Amino acid sequence: MQVGLSQDFYREKLYKKFGFKNAEELLKDWANDHAKNWDANNLLSKLQTWQLNDISKGPLYKNNYIKALKSIRAKTILMPCNQDLYFRTEDNKYENKFIPRSSLRPIDSSYGHCAANPGNDKNFEKQLDKNIKELLS
């Protein structure tokens, strides 16, 4: 279980679905899991990927982010979670303006950043399956 959950998750006490009596129990479990099971080097590598990931870097786009977005040719569906506190829907709205053949389909989920975790949100999974089928058809 991750801490990237929305305020609604805690208000709705959805942590009980995972067997926790209260939010504090959930957070302690998360901290223990990360301390015992996550290698610090893996976390540092993940952070570095987030910090350095930029499709506009390099000689082709010369740091022109909009030009890089406009070069995407694949049919694209952007599915941000409106309650994600890490990756905001506003960012995808901006990107959607420049990606040809893209559509923006935000999803509401109390699971926030964790909406896409398998088993968390059946509505998210249904929407994801529907959009994948559309992309592949």
Regions found by a protein language model. Give the residues of each.
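Alpha/beta-hydrolase
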Residues: 1-74, 86
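Short, well-ordered coil↔helix boundary/capping segments
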Residues: 37, 63-66, 82-89, 119-122, ...
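Active-site proximal loops enriched in glycine and acidic residues that flank catalytic Cys/His/Asp
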Residues: 47, 80-83, 106-109
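Conserved loop-alpha-helix segment in the C-terminal half of the alpha/beta-hydrolase fold
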Residues: 67-77, 81-103
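Catalytic active-site module of serine/aspartate enzymes centered on a nucleophile-bearing elbow/loop
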Residues: 93-137
